[in-house]
Amino acid sequence: NDLPMHLAVGHWILENGQVPNVDPFSATGHGGPWVAHEWLAATLFKSVESLGHPNFLIALAVLLSASLGGLLELIQRSFGVPAFWRLLLLVPVWLAVGRRLMLRPHLLALNLVLLVWWITRHGRPSPRWLWVLIPVMTLWANLHGSFLLGIAYIIGDLCIFSQGHTLPRKQRFMIAGGSVLATLVNPHGVALYLFPFQLALDPVFTAGVFEWLPPWTAPGFMTTPAAISGIGLFSLALLGSALQGWGSENSGLRGLLKRPGFALSLLAAVTATFLASRQLRHLALASLLWAPLIGVLWGTLNWRISPSLQKAALAFPVALVLLLGFQGYPAGIDAQGQWRWRSIGSGWSPQTPVIPIDTLVNQWEVSGVLLCEYEFGGFTSYISGGKLRPTMDSRNTVYTPEFFLAHEAALRGENEELRKTLTEKASAILVHPGKPGRRSL
């Protein structure tokens, strides 16, 4: 339900030639202040779709997913991770990351996380590369709210954990300061800095949306390949650290922490793991950050690996390709205890409300207010081109938590006053008949 909202926002921006600072879509939040923090991603998505076929969006998702793999390979090589460990980690890393490889702004943000990481590493022997961080941070601030992570990492790498940098201290501080100032180049100014906290600390949405739940409380998540692989990666990190031991001046963890960039990278991976323990949506980030570090932890143990075993490691990427080719990787276990496979297809899923909304707008020529589920709001704004204005959508910063709960209560029939108000305003009603109280509408 997020991609259609981004496409609607991108369409509005391209049509009006500006970034909205008030909500132009909702019937109940219409005209209220709104920080369109992912406006550039929305414009990109809509521009790609406008090339002529929705499958161009799928191609963009494939391209961004592939670039993640390319950047991760560059980072692992910069750490000196042996090919054996790079191959061995392919399957668990990409099974853990796979469920987040969807076309949403966070896919761009994951690429930028790895890009900043690689630039800070490559910038040690080639300091001119560090100046690229400034335009990268301008781009990041307009694509996704996670740009604050980039600011923190750049300051940490250039100003605190600066071992191995050949650029003079003054210039490093200039780049760090320039990277911070670069994020102010956005349509919302300093308001953009508050938005990520408003989004992440909303108690209503974080408790009601699957990806914002802790892994162990999200229904069925702990049996998915993503969760199993994530646990496996974290276990490898812990075991590798234990086998390393604290060590001496030049060995063990003590020696690794003195390597350029390793200490900050380890701190970033631990932080991402903590975030993933709070909200499962961060599992992909944690897995990507741990992959090179696990390779370092195990690759520096100086264990002798026979050539035949090294060749056997090639079986892992081959197995991954075969697994992905067989109708997609397993998405979970069904009620009968069988693996549920993802099916291959294109276009919008029939489980989405595309057909009923298209019928309302293009066949029945309905316009005005649409009383609907929050997950239908983005589709409504996108498909109707603004002709229908939903009473609720997934942009939690447009609505207060109190109104979101009241809207849900009205749909269930537990808030008669608001239900009456909304139905009187509505030109049409689109609800999920399987949810409580909907059939009475």
Per-region residue spans from a language model:
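Transmembrane-helix motifs of polytopic, lipid-linked glycan transferases
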Residues: 59-79
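Specific aromatic-rich, kink-prone transmembrane helix
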Residues: 71, 93-96, 108-125, 154-158, ...
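Short hydrophobic alpha-helices at membrane interfaces in multi-pass membrane enzymes
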Residues: 122-138, 169-175, 259-269
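Periplasmic/luminal catalytic loop of GT-C fold multi-pass membrane glycosyltransferases
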Residues: 383, 402-441
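Membrane-proximal, lumen/periplasm-facing interface regions of secretory-pathway glyco-
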Residues: 310-364, 375-377, 384, 395-396, ...
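Membrane-interface alpha helices of multi-pass inner-membrane proteins
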Residues: 92-97, 129-145, 153-154, 178-183, ...
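Transmembrane catalytic cores of multi-pass membrane glycosyltransferases
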Residues: 14, 19, 145-258, 287
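Short periplasmic/luminal acceptor-recognition loop of GT-C membrane glycosyltransferases, typified by
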Residues: 359-402, 427-434
